[in-house]
Regions:
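Generic low-complexity segments that are intrinsically disordered, proline-rich and/or Lys/Arg-biased
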Residues: 4-9, 24, 64-67, 71, ...
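Generic hydrophobic secondary-structure signal
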Residues: 3, 34, 38, 55-57, ...
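Active-site acidic/histidine clusters and adjacent loop/turn architecture
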Residues: 1-52
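A structural signal for short, well-ordered beta-strand segments and their strand-loop junctions
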Residues: 50-58, 122-123, 131
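Catalytic cores and adjacent binding grooves of peptidoglycan-active enzymes
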Residues: 71-166
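Active-site nucleotide-donor binding segment shared across nucleotidyl transfer reactions
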Residues: 53-74
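Short secondary-structure junctions
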Residues: 45-54, 108-114
Length: 166
């Protein structure tokens, strides 16, 4: 359970609970794989840019989401949405993540995220949506995590789209 805002989410990670918790809402549980996946993303882009690249969590638990919205953020443990902390790099990083998702079979980034147990990786417009679920997943025999979904959701030219990369 996330309760103390300034404590690390997990030992060895540079995330505090404040990045996942909104004081206006109640405490919630978080899948351990999600901060590990975010750390894998931070590490990947820090190595690539050869400087510290921050990832900001923009959304987690939203219990007041309308019922017609997907339950990923409404029901704990919730999904997390995130963006690059550096506004100037957001489009570039999401574009790079999109490229990694499209070539997921050979992607070090995707492999490192899947190793954490995170099995839902979706680009949603301008953010990255990460989650763990047990249904509506594709089966990929031979992978460390065989059941996962990698894709992209969004709106383009006023029309919604959903692309599955895996």
């Amino acid at each position: 359970k996330i309760q103390k805002k300034q404590e690390p989410v997990m030992v060895g990670l540079n995330f505090t609970h404040a990045e996942f918790w909104n004081p206006a809402k109640c405490d919630f549980e978080l899948y351990q794989c999600l901060p590990l996946a975010l750390q894998a993303i931070r590490d990947f882009f820090t190595k690539e840019y050869q400087r510290e690249i921050g990832i900001t969590v923009t959304s987690t638990y939203r219990p007041n989401d309308p019922i017609n919205f997907p339950a990923a953020h409404r029901i704990p443990p919730p999904a997390v949405d995130s963006v690059a902390s550096d506004v100037n790099l957001r489009n570039e990083i999401i574009s790079r993540i999109r490229s990694e998702f499209k070539r997921w079979e050979k992607s070090e980034l995707v492999r490192n995220i899947l190793k954490t147990g995170t099995n839902v990786l979706i680009i949603e417009n301008t953010c990255l949506h990460l989650h763990f679920r047990k249904e509506n997943l594709s089966f990929h025999p031979g992978y460390e995590c065989e059941h996962f979904y990698i894709g992209e959701w969004g709106v383009k030219d006023g029309k919604q789209f959903n692309i599955a990369y895996s």
